[in-house]
């Protein structure tokens, strides 16, 4: 899987194994990888100019989800709630969150299960374009290091598509002076319930970068495709 189809380490691996039975999921049908892999699936994310990939991240997960459902002979019913959640995010996004995050010295995302994966996505995007030190942790790891870093200049963003344990973790942070935010879907459910939260955390990163005067499309020191190992 490659958004650009030009990533150097993936190209090196393809050249080494010379796959005859392989599938490429990409957002570029004119890349080098398409010359070496026989089966190609388009993400249909549309052109993505920004260095920090957002649309292609979301679309790649949707492609995998749809493939798995097809292999199992099941209907991808969760997609309906996924779309509903995206519509809710458009209507309910809180612009005060980026304003508060922009004042912080460090930020942590917390989540469990699929939400933990999205916590890593949220942390990466905030680091990439807002330049704020940010990490994504599982809720079970809160007391294994990250809690020691909490101060009144720290923010913790909890992601919960279906996990009630998160509330107690956020209370631990609040008791130590940290700022807490809680993000929850209106329509919870599985992988796509968590994936819809990725849109929210990506918007937080985008508007935090804008709040700090950064160019969210062209972050410093980063390139769209890693073409040199």
Question: What are these model-derived regions, one by one?
Answer:
Residues 1-229:
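A SIS-like phosphosugar-recognition module
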């Amino acid at each position: 899987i490659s958004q650009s189809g030009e990533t150097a380490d993936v190209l090196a691996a393809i050249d080494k194994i010379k796959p005859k039975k392989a599938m490429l999921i990409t957002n570029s049908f004119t890349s080098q990888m398409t010359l070496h892999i026989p089966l190609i699936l388009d993400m249909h994310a549309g052109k993505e100019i920004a260095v920090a990939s957002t649309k292609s991240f979301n679309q790649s997960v949707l492609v995998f989800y749809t493939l798995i459902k097809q292999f199992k002979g099941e209907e991808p019913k969760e997609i309906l709630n996924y779309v509903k959640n995206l519509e809710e995010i458009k209507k309910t996004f809180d612009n005060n969150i980026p304003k508060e995050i922009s004042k912080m010295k460090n930020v942590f995302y917390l989540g469990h299960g699929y939400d933990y994966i999205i916590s890593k996505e949220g942390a990466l995007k905030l680091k990439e374009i807002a330049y704020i030190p940010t990490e994504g942790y599982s809720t079970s790891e809160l007391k294994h290091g990250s809690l020691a870093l909490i101060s009144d200049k720290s923010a913790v963003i909890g992601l919960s598509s279906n996990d009630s344990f998160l509330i107690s973790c956020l209370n631990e942070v609040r008791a130590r002076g940290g700022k807490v935010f809680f993000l929850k879907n209106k329509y919870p459910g599985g992988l796509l319930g968590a994936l819809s939260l990725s849109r929210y955390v990506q918007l937080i990163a985008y508007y935090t970068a804008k709040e700090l005067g950064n160019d969210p499309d062209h972050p410093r020191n980063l390139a769209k495709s890693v073409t040199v190992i």
